[in-house]
């Protein structure tokens, strides 16, 4: 079994993707942006997980040599890509774009969904005990869901998973700034370098500790690479 483990596990994820397709064969036609968000957070994210785990198995299978199975598995990859990229991402992406277009055009965000820029005020400022915030750049929601499941199993503790709408544009320097305490974020272009300011202060990694301490002197920001 060990020799064929990656093939079996890859096929399991294909089966999961096919089952998801059957459950949602009518496509994605949710009429409300908030509901699309809710559906993804509670259900649709599973397709991203299946896709990631399939490719993990596929990449590992390439470390062993089995000419017949390798060729067959590569044909499976084509089917998986069609199902994921065309049907899932294409269909769900269109549904989301259609239902949020008006609000995005008028406000630059969907109003009824929690905003990343409110993170500090909603989750840190009201806390009555010590809070640790770990920021992992570009970590997908479905990976967080898998991590939450693993923490529940290993620690037998209560783990709550939530989501917030990213600031726009959704790039690192804006997202990191949005998590800091602020009343207003502004962008500044100086010597062809774009900076994000929180109430006029730089939010570069070297200054985040200062921004935090300006609100709570007991705060500390640490960077790891």
Describe the predicted segments one by one.
Residues 2, 110-127, 141-221:
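Active-site nucleophile/metal-coordination loop of metallo-enzymes that catalyze phosphate/sulfate
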Residues 74, 78-95, 140-141:
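Conserved structural scaffold segments of CAZyme catalytic domains across common CAZy folds
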Residues 1-84:
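Non-catalytic accessory regions outside enzyme or core folds
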Residues 24-31, 86-91, 202-218:
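Charged, low-complexity, helix/coiled-coil-prone segments
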Residues 225:
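Conserved small/polar residues in nucleotide/adenosyl-binding loops
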Residues 131-136:
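Short hydrophobic beta-strand that contains or immediately precedes a catalytic carboxylate
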Residues 89-122:
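Charged, flexible boundary elements
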